[in-house]
Amino acid sequence: MTDNFADADVALVRSAAMHDLDLPESLLAIARAGAGVNNIPLDKCADKGVVVFNTPGANANGVKELVLCGMLLASRDIIGGNKWVANNTDNENISKDMEKAKKNFAGNEIKGKKLGVIGLGAIGRLVANAAESMGMEVYGNDPFISVEGALSLKRDVHLVKTREEIFKECDFITVHTPLVDDTKKMINKETIAMMKDGVVVLNFARDLLVDDEAMCEALASGKVKKYVTDFPNPNVAGVEGVIA
């Protein structure tokens, strides 16, 4: 947060937490550079008459690309192969040795795999459509999807009524929901137990959608193959199987 916030008329915020801040009397509005507003004290703003607005969809394509990249990184050990090359820069026989070592970085195609998309807002719909174009069998769940949103999905994207159907059926699960009471830690010990062995979970939406402790246990046991997230924190950073 900038030093001159105390005199601000308007604040532009990305990820900084504002709940513990004293809102200046001069403040008229807060603009969130993104869709979620969970880092903004909405009740306090309402009491003071501060207008809050967001920018849903502004970064949707960029996040979609990150999710697709995350699925590919989780399917093929590209990171491991890159580290192997970096550790063998002085090896005169690197080309020959790589032929022997590359089997350690083998992976699987995502074509034909089942992807579950939980939350079909601007980002979720783009992910679903792009994954379907890449040959994945896509399932989506969103009880609040609009008619316009549903019509923007490709015809082969399967809409399901519950998250549980996705937890049980899909090889990849990506979450794209806001953080509310119903979604907080929705990826937890109980829901992970429903999932296929070796599932890949992706979270580019909100940090607290996933129970870190349950996820780390699932990674250690092999229940979850990879956890790909845009929210590294002390609980998951450096844990085997985490791509962050």
Give a label for each model feature:
Residues A130-A131, M195:
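Aromatic pocket-lining residues of Rossmann-like dinucleotide-binding sites
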Residues P56-K114:
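Phosphate-binding beta-alpha-beta segment of Rossmann-like dinucleotide-binding domains, i.e.
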Residues G124-R125:
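N-terminal Rossmann-fold NAD(P) dinucleotide-binding loop
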Residues K113, L120-G121:
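Glycine-rich Rossmann-fold phosphate-binding loop(s) that bind the pyrophosphate
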Residues L27, K111-K114, K189, G198:
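Phosphate-coordination loops involved in phosphoryl transfer and adenosine-cofactor binding
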Residues A16-D22, P143-G241:
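Rossmann-like adenosine-cofactor binding region
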Residues M1-F53, N188:
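An N-terminal-biased, well-structured beta-alpha scaffold segment characteristic
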